Amino acid sequence: MAQLDPKTINKIVLAYSGGLDTSIIARWLQETYDAEVITFTADIGQGEEVEPARAKAEAMGIKHIHIEDLREEFARDYVFPMFRANAIYEGEYLLGTSIARPLIAKRLVEIAKEHNADAISHGATGKGNDQVRFELGAVALSPDVVTIAPWREWDLSSRESLMEYAKEHNISIDYAGNKKKSPYSMDANLLHISYEGGILEDPYAEAEDDMWRWSVSPEQAPDVPQYLELEYAKGDIVAIDGEALKPYEVMIKLNEIGGKHGIGRLDIVENRYVGMKSRGCYETPAGTIMLKAHRGIESLTLDREAAHLKDELMPRYAKTIYNGYWFSPERMMLQALIDKSQEYVNGTVRVKLYKGAVSVVGRKSDDSLFDEKIATFEDDAGAYDQKDAEGFIRLNGLRLAIEASRGRDLSK
């Protein structure tokens, strides 16, 4: 990554949410670098109005303001390819934050080139994974990019000091509409909403009921289950209950329905790439349904060894994304294999949603490898000769028999 003297930096493109941190960063960049700040705000389904970010940026004298609806690109080119892999980090985390960063980094770099900017900037702290994800993504796409990470440079180390800075610099932080300021650090997109900080910093403390925003508690979910039919084409959901939908529409609908049934709540302690453990709570209704349903259609259409190979490679794929290497040779290689495996992953999965649980209750496909004539417990009319199993078992047990014949005790 290239390094420049601050005096040579005249334009900076900032990933800007319009919130407290990035508003302060915008002003800090203007003062510290005496540079023009260009803001970029991405709508990736966070469920909030992004237009207020424009007014806040204008109030700080920012002339070039980019606000973009990236929901479809995010779902189509990032989330859906990841779900073809059934990716889960450390057995539980569906990578909701991890998968959102590459697209933002990509647009930061592209906007910087459009404006001939000297640097990009983000609001990720020096303790988290996001700084790594943003900067690895940026350097992979623009090797000479200069990234300014204020949290690693300034001395504003607490929420109180940030508020004092905002007051001193006449930065308007509008909390209107928030009757109760959340004690949590939250991040949302089409795939999930995350919660960190507050009482969650004690890993033994249970999250408060009023923290959750996207879902009801399973106990309060409807007493009647809801069934959905999800239609797949090459590993991607293309319709719900017969209604053709775009990828981002699929996620919006599944989030809404899943949330009503208490689907997708998660409370975990994860290992960050930077070395520390972190406790976080997540709501991922759509992702939880998508993962279960995708495994359901794959169980019918994927060859056994192809399915097992995917399962073996999945942890590596998930770790690659979690650590910030979406734009990397290894992710591209793994993606090519994964996408090839989805050639015949077509059909329909029927899922049941009930009080926090997702169950696959039916699956069908014209590309099914399930042969009822062979699998039946009834008369198979000679489709499968059970005597063939004797030789199969003998050959597979040969090495074990040889071990035992040499006096080796395999029972220990």
Curated annotation (Swiss-Prot):
Against SUPFAM superfamilies, the record matches this protein to:
Adenine nucleotide alpha hydrolases-like (SSF52402), Argininosuccinate synthetase, C-terminal domain (SSF69864)
Its UniProt entry gives the catalysed reaction(s) as: L-citrulline + L-aspartate + ATP = 2-(N(omega)-L-arginino)succinate + AMP + diphosphate + H(+)
For this protein, the record's InterPro entries field holds: Arginosuc_syn_C, Arginosuc_syn_N, Arginosuc_synth, Arginosuc_synth_CS, Arginosuc_synth_type_1_subfam, AS_cat/multimer_dom_body, Rossmann-like_a/b/a_fold
Q: Where in the cell is it found?
A: Cytoplasm
Which residues constitute the signal peptide according to the record? none
Tell me the pathway.
Amino-acid biosynthesis; L-arginine biosynthesis; L-arginine from L-ornithine and carbamoyl phosphate: step 2/3
How is this protein named in the record? Argininosuccinate synthase
Organism expressing this protein natively: Psychrobacter arcticus (strain DSM 17307 / VKM B-2377 / 273-4)
What broad taxonomic lineage does this protein's source fall under? Bacteria, Pseudomonadati, Pseudomonadota, Gammaproteobacteria, Moraxellales
